[in-house]
Amino acid sequence: KSGKNYMMMGTSVYTYQCLYVKSLIDQGKLGKIQYLRGTHFQDMEGWPDYWKGLPPLHYATHAISPLLFLSGQRASRVHCFGSGTMREELVRNYGNPYPVETAVFRLEDGRTSADVTRSLFETAHEYVEGFSVFGDKMSFEWNFENDAPYVYTFEEGMTETNIGNRGRVISRQEVHCPNREEILPEAIRKYTTEFAILDPDNPDMYMKQGGGHHGSHPHLVNEFVSSIIEEREPMIDVYTAADWTAAGICGHESAMKNGEEVVIPEFR
């Protein structure tokens, strides 16, 4: 109760992709959300020592936050399993034996579930930060960092079926998510995409700016500064930040208990 504003700089809920899906949900195009899935694969070899052997779900907000943000819920319970083995040097730091963890979360409505898979070490995969949201009218799937996402839509009418009358016809469409610069002050709109700043004294030298984490940075800055000016809580306030972080912490606790259910604390 300091009277100050605190905001978690959660890049994953302000990416092109997440803002696009939020728009689909707000327009009712996805319909009823049935299931959500998040992934984050990243090899952390060579990073500072405090990363070595970190439990995967202790740094899982990139995979968890879009799911909770888009569902408008917090996670209430979790079952999680760890997978694989790591060299002893990595296990020693945190007592964590797992390079990969997969969690299934029950959301607070008691009906919706979400799963998250996170890896940090000794797993041969390119960098991936992606999520999927499955609705009863339309679904969105983004599986690979630099690939375009897709939407899947039921054709109109419950009687539209595939050959043999089994299963409804579903269309698949590649989507290109807009950067939503129009909702930002004009002065910072350019930072949603990458551009080069040239050094006039060294024409061959330049520095890349903007576009980080799929255009999220200016949206985060705008939300935080606006919350101060407007004297309100920011979108990712302390309680939301705690919800997103605790989900991963409790997920790892479940993994260390061989998948036992762990109840996630409520902080409000």
Please describe what each predicted stretch is.
Residues 186-220:
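Alpha-helix-centered segments that form part of catalytic cores
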Residues 236-238:
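Conserved alpha/beta-hydrolase "acid-adjacent" motif
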Residues 4, 31, 253-268:
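C-terminal capping/lid region of NAD(P)-dependent oxidoreductase domains
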Residues 1-49, 53-56:
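A contiguous active-site-proximal alpha/beta segment in oxidoreductase catalytic domains
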